[in-house]
Amino acid sequence: FAMKDGRMQPFLPGLPGSNSNRITEAHAWSGYALAKWTRGAWTLTAGARYEDVSLLKRDFTAADPRRSGKVRIETPNHAAAWLPGFGFNVKLTSQLSLLGGVHRGFAPPSATLYQKAENSTNFEGGARWSSRRLKIEAIGFFNNYRNMLGSDLLAAGGQGTLEQFNVGKAAVGGAEFLAQAQPRIGHVTFPLQLTYTYTHTEMRNEFSSDAWGDVHVGDEIPYIFRHAANAQLGAEYRGYELNVGLRYNGAMRTVPGQGAMPKSETIPSHFIVDASAKARLNRHVTLTINAINVTNARYLVSRHPSGLRAGHPFGLYGGAIFNW
C-alpha cells in the first residue's frame, strides 16, 4: 500500500494466501421446553432442549488460492442431542434453603471427519443462606464427561490450527463458596464479598494429540487452577464508591500430568491487588478510575505459546460515564 493525499491505496498486489485456505459453515437449530412446579417450600424445575448442528468444511488447498473449486476437499459433520435437565429448591426456613440439579451438557464438534460432540452429565447441590445484609452459598459440583473436546491452540501448547480433538472420558469436580455482606455504619455502606473455588480434574482414558502430547489415565487437565479465591472490600457514601479487590490463584499445570508438578510445567501461585473508585458528580456525569495490580507484582499466566507469558503489570485507567 502507498499513502496518497492522506489515504491508503493499493500499490503492489500480493499473492493470495495459501495457508488455511478453507471455508467452514454451520447450520444449526434448537428448541426447548421448560416447566416449573411450586408447592409449599418446594420448587421443582424440569426442562429439555434439542440441538441440531450440521457442519461443512471446504478445503481449497494451497493449489487453488483463488478458490475456483477445481481442487476441493469437503468434510461434513453432524451432531444432534436431547439435553434434559432437572433442578430443585426447598426452603427449610425463611433464610435457609437447599438446592440441586442434574443437567446434560453438550458442545458441537468441528467440521472434522469422525469428530464427536462433547457430552456430559453435570451434577450440583448445596445450601444457601440469605438475609437482608448477609448471603452465604456453598455448592458442590461434578461434571462427568463421556467425551470432552480439546482445541489445538497455540495458547495451550498446540500448533494453532484451532482444530478440535476428542479427549474422551474425563471428570471435573469441586466446590464453590460465596459470602456477601453489606454492613452499614452511619451513612456509609461497606459491601464485602468473598469467593473460593476448589476444582479437581482427571482424565479417564489415554490418548495422544499434537496439543497435549501423551495423556494417561489420572492426569489432570492443564490450565485449570485447583485453588482460586477472590475478596472484594468496598465503601459507598452517597455518590462515591471505593473498592479494593484481592485475587489469589494457586499453582496450575501447563501440560497434562499427575503427582508433583515439575517446575518447567507449572504456573506458580500468585496474589494480585486491584482497586477502583467512582464519583457521581451529578445525575448525568460519573467519573471512574481503575488500578490493576496495584503492587506491580510479577507473576506468570502461561507457558504457551513459545515460552513464558507475564501477567498484567501495574495499570491505571480513568474514564467518564455520561447518561441522558
Briefly describe each language-model feature range:
Residues 1-3, 39-41, 50-56, 102-108, ...:
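Transmembrane beta-strands of outer-membrane beta-barrel pores
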Residues 41-44, 95-98, 133-137, 186-190, ...:
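Repeated loop/turn-to-beta-strand initiation elements of outer-membrane beta-barrel proteins
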Residues 14-22, 63-75, 109-123, 160-166, ...:
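Extracellular loop and loop/strand-boundary signature of outer-membrane beta-barrel proteins
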Residues 91, 97-101, 117-182, 190-206:
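Membrane-embedded beta-barrel scaffold of Gram-negative outer-membrane proteins
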Residues 38-44, 165-257, 295:
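Gram-negative outer-membrane beta-barrel transporters
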Residues 146, 190-191, 248-257, 278-324:
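C-terminal beta-signal and adjacent terminal beta-strands/loops
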Residues 1-93, 109, 113-114:
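Signature of Gram-negative outer-membrane beta-barrel scaffolds
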Residues 31-37, 86-90, 125-129, 175-181, ...:
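Residues on the lipid-exposed face of transmembrane beta-strands in outer-membrane beta-barrel proteins
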